[in-house]
Amino acid sequence: MNKPPVTTALLDRGRDRFGIFCSPCHGAGGDGNGIIVQRGMPRPTSYHDERLRTADDQHFFDVISNGYGAMYSHAARVPPRDRWAIVAYIRALQLSRHASIDDVPPEQRAKLSEAR
């Protein structure tokens, strides 16, 4: 399956699937501080590390599909479209952490200022 376009629906699905399949290890914010770490398992790499922020989308899809290190394959549990949804959500997490106000369109900046 080719990578689908990123839509709100895809991001919503990605957030849901991330919460089920990824956050127990990677944590809700993708920092690598999921519940498994609290139980003594090794900490997975943070999605906010430079190496993963600069990795291409296919890397994340492949890791979900095939596993990596201590992470097992999720291919039997997560269909391809959901894998792409998770990838899109990981990118949203990364952007949310590393964005500046200049990345926000001017009309949205005004709304953010009003909300404060």
Short names for language-model regions:
Residues 1, 8, 19, 28-31, ...:
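Flexible coil segments in periplasmic/lumen-exposed cytochrome c-class electron-transfer proteins
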Residues 7-13:
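A cross-kingdom signal targeting lumenal/periplasmic-facing segments of multi-pass membrane
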Residues 15, 19-24:
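Membrane-embedded segments
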Residues 60-63:
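Long, soluble amphipathic alpha-helical coiled-coil "stalk/rod" segments that act as peripheral stators
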